[in-house]
Amino acid sequence: DYAPTADAFQQESQKRIRELYMYDVLRADRCISSNSIEARVPFGDLDFVRYVMAIDPEKKLNSYGKGKYLLRKAFEGDWLPPEILWREKAAFSDAVGHSMVDDIKEYADSLYTDEEFQLRRANYSAHCMPFTKESLFYREIFEKYYYDQSRTIVDFWMPNKAWPGCNVNDPSA
């Protein structure tokens, strides 16, 4: 939604595809496999990905006022009812319900004073420093179980903050 140019959008899309296995795909695979279930990911089909990446990036920019515009247009007609097709995008974690995410944020806020947050986040300044109390909460859980393994996590899976207007700060997304 924030790409300043079509070329920047295409480059970011290529980067996301290259790194996808480290983020949502890995998380989904581990959660599903631990329950002896196999996932099918239709939008992960290689032919589909190649097709989408070959579309003119200018057409993929969010100049229509709605994210995922081309995907929504593809399912217009008899495929999906308009109230589903054109509803607001939701973060991956929203499927668990807003109340749970809000509860986690509230809990994380209660764990640390602002001063404690600044001091404790500084422990991780060398790599992927937490940027909210919630992200510090997640990081400390990670460190408890995977001590000194943070280098395996390349970066936060967040929108490109170098782009103008992009001030998303939600580790739950």
Region locations from a protein language model:
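Adenosyl-5′-phosphate
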Residues: 4-173
